[in-house]
């Protein structure tokens, strides 16, 4: 029996159900009868739900269509991810750190809040997690970090994106320096007097992240 790990953005890149059907027919023609979907998103948001709905139509064509848990979708996965961030980033005591996720509009973004609390519980107190949209946004972060800077005397914030792929959310929404109607995270921090170190790296640039969340099927049932 042949299994395929199918990273979901490859399916979502098909903008119509006809294109999606063609992709799935190609898989069937190549002998695939099980599709294992690894969500390339941090939480079970709109994109994952959309893909689930689209694939539901084709479930009778395959013996199994199974979804792995998103990065922040379980306590075990979140704990692994927090340890991964500590190992990859290091969190030097010289700086404050801001991790920026996408978030969901109209959402409490509870997964990101839990990640922040988990990092603090592991002794990493100089880090906060914020989102581009929904609760826990950059405006809320600015209020919090200004107080922290007064207490710590630190001058510089290092920004890391909590986004898996390098795209416009990273290059524009977080790090853009161009004049636009909506200011980037970088611009908002600089306008509020903070010195910023940019780390323009998606999570997929970390080998440990790819090994755990993108390249293997160990989290799927047999």
Name each region found by the language model.
Residues 1-222:
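Active-site-proximal alpha-helix that buttresses catalytic centers in soluble enzyme cores
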